[in-house]
Design a protein with these regions (language model features):
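Flexible cytoplasmic loops linking transmembrane helices in multi-pass membrane transporters
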Residues: 42-71, 249-322, 371-393, 574-593
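Central mid-sequence intracellular linker of multi-pass
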Residues: 2-3, 62-67, 191-194, 219-301, ...
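C-terminal transmembrane bundle
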Residues: 84, 113-116, 120-123, 154, ...
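Helix-breaking motifs and short loop linkers at transmembrane-helix boundaries and internal kinks
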Residues: 86, 101-102, 133-134, 155-161, ...
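Extracytoplasmic
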Residues: 68-105, 126, 175-176, 322-327, ...
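Conserved MFS/SLC helix-loop-helix module at the cytosolic interface between two early adjacent transmembrane helices
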Residues: 121-160
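Cytoplasmic helix-loop-helix junction between adjacent transmembrane helices
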Residues: 165-204
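Cytosolic juxtamembrane N-terminal segment immediately preceding the first transmembrane helix
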Residues: 1-86, 99, 532, 537, ...
Length: 593
């Protein structure tokens, strides 16, 4: 039955004052009914009904046929690849930019760095608006702006113009915060891991596609073609998205369905969730600021988020440092521009190996969670199981690369093999940390994973410019080996955190203020499994919004206990919303009741 909302403030106050507590029985709550019900239509006269997911589940993204879901996902795969392709292809233009504008190659690399750094912030800035206005218009706007900013970069009259519009391009990129959200729009919580693994591959793979193609471009065309190719790819991607990807955001779909039902006369009192509450109440400036700041707050105050984000960010930053260092390494074997670009393919091979390894690992994880629905370790830390074996590939790969990258008489294939091992680690770390944090933080998973994504892009951007001086100036004659050895030692320390969290995760989560509130809500809302915990949503399914008015934000990719999805009762939804409201009030500095 659709939820009913008063149409004026006095009725709203009355409804609020008489709202039933989860502990109160149905019989006792009935006496608070503000008006008689029309039995024929089950509608309270003069009131609006809110359309919930349970009322039209078959019309939402979760009920799309499998072929349609994976068609949408494949286009989102291309979108994510395009975004990351833009971050890396520019590096092949640095020599041409240096010659054209009379700046050093080191200065020219600032165009890559500023794009990545602003990309880190852009992902966080775009995500809340995709939840408010829908995924489709926000991605179209993002893709369109990025494409527009490519033109002045290619036609730049001076170097400053390149930097300015590369910065705008990075800031305009919506990134993984929106694409991961789309997974949650069309897949239930027990079906999302395979889809996430697919999109994670597009994210890391797009970064490698840049230098592979860039080698051919740099060798045969002017530097501007590194930008024009980004534009061509971007326009084609935007067209595919515009034509073949429908709106998937649950609340927006509910609004549209409600409008159709009113227009057809099926139910003149039905309204979508965003139609019930005015925009200003849902998205005040203060609430938007709180939403934007939450990922950074969690990054600094949550040990799990900080540790796993640093590990993930460091491994990704290595890839962008590699882009700068591979030229130094493989020139020792007289590799040309094209061959240096192709030397990145082993990393891509590593990504494929890791992706395929996760398929049986996900199947194993699902079986374990089903077999032990009340075991916290099985529900949470078991998601890191494969990472116990693949995370050591990071220091192993770096150390092996360090002592096989010294040039002849050592064969170049040795360093390529170890580069592939680093690729296995990079993919595995990103996939496993995203999966774990989403499960651990539930409705705040967007903020938790936002910190992860932010650290990956920000650290990659910050380390892009000093990468070449680092590899050339560290140590003496064996400077390449010494520089990579230092990176291997740093990665060894970070990888230890995986084992600490795997074994001590329950203890760390109990010390987390966010996780404590969520655990309390899970345990007290009639003992329902966490997979039925609605997060910030109307209804029980990922992607819906229940706490949007409170400034709560979610990618809505959930992965809590249990495997099912089902409608949570109105009283349980009410209770969980109040628990989330307590967290949000604390963030705003308000007293909780």
């Amino acid at each position: 039955m659709a939820a009913r909302f008063p149409t004026n403030h006095s009725q709203l106050a009355q409804a609020h004052s008489t709202a039933p507590d989860p502990e109160i029985s149905e019989a006792s709550s009935d006496k608070h009914s503000p008006a008689p019900i029309n039995e024929k239509n089950n509608v309270i006269p003069g009131e609006k009904e809110e359309l919930t997911e349970a009322d039209c589940y078959d019309e939402l993204g979760y009920s799309f046929p499998v072929w349609k879901k994976w068609t949408i996902l494949t286009i989102i795969f291309i979108v994510q690849t395009s975004m990351n392709f833009n971050t890396s292809l520019y590096s092949n233009a640095t020599m041409g930019i240096s010659e054209a504008y009379g700046v050093s190659e080191q200065a020219a690399r600032a165009g890559a760095a500023v794009f990545l750094i602003l990309y880190a912030f852009g992902c966080e800035l775009w995500a809340p608006w995709s939840e408010e206005f829908g995924r489709w218009p926000i991605l179209q706007l993002s893709l369109g702006l990025v494409n527009i900013w490519q033109i002045p970069v290619a036609l730049a009259p001076n170097f400053g113009t390149i930097i300015a519009f590369r910065a705008l391009g990075g800031l305009s990129s919506a990134g993984g915060s929106v694409t991961l959200g789309m997974i949650a729009d069309i897949f239930e919580s027990d079906q999302q891991q395979y889809a996430v693994a697919y999109i994670v591959f597009s994210s890391v793979g797009g970064s490698i596609l840049g230098p592979v193609i860039g080698g051919f471009v740099e060798a045969n065309l002017k530097w501007q073609w590194c930008i024009w190719i980004q534009l061509i790819f971007g326009v084609a991607t935007q067209a595919l998205h515009a034509v073949f990807v429908p709106e998937t955001r649950t609340t927006v779909m509910l609004n549209n369905i409600a409008k159709k039902r009113r227009k057809s006369g099926q139910n003149p009192n039905i309204y979508g969730p965003d139609e019930i509450t005015p925009f200003r109440e849902r998205f005040s400036i203060k609430e938007v600021f709180i939403t934007w700041m939450r990922p950074f707050k969690m990054f600094l105050t949550e040990p799990i988020v900080l540790t796993l984000s640093l590990l993930s960010g460091f491994s990704d930053a290595l890839i962008f440092m590699f882009i700068q260092s591979f030229m130094l390494v493989y020139k020792q074997w007289d590799f040309g521009t094209v061959e240096i670009g192709l030397s990145f393919l082993p990393i891509l091979v590593g990504y494929f190996i890791a992706w395929f390894a996760f398929i049986p690992a996900i199947r194993r994880n699902i079986a374990e969670r089903k077999a032990k629905p009340e075991d916290e370790h099985a529900q949470y830390e078991s998601r890191l199981w494969l990472l116990l074996f693949t995370a050591p590939c990071l220091p192993i790969g770096l150390m092996g690369f360090a002592w096989t990258c010294g040039g002849p008489p050592i064969h170049w294939i040795g360093s390529s093999i170890f580069a592939a091992i680093v690729g296995i680690a990079n993919y595995s770390i990103y996939m496993a940390t995203i999966d774990y944090m989403i499960c651990a933080y539930g409705p705040y998973s967007a903020s938790a994973t936002g910190g992860n994504g932010w650290s990956r892009d920000f650290l990659a951007g910050v380390l892009t410019v000093p990468a070449t001086p680092y590899f050339t100036n560290i140590g003496g004659q064996k400077h390449l080996q010494d520089a990579s050895t230092i990176l291997a030692c740093i990665s060894f320390v970070l990888v230890i955190a995986v084992y600490v969290i795997y074994w001590k995760g329950p203890v760390l989560r109990k010390r987390s203020p966010f996780a404590q509130h969520l655990a309390s809500a899970r345990n007290e809302s009639t003992g329902r499994r966490a997979s039925l915990f609605p997060g910030p949503g109307y209804g029980s399914h990922p992607g819906s919004r229940g706490a949007s008015r409170m400034g709560s934000r979610s990618v809505s990719y959930t992965g809590g206990k249990g495997q099912g999805g089902g409608a949570m009762g109105a009283k349980q939804q009410d209770y969980v919303r109040r628990k989330l409201e307590e967290v949000n009030k604390e963030e705003r500095g308000e007293k909780t009741e």
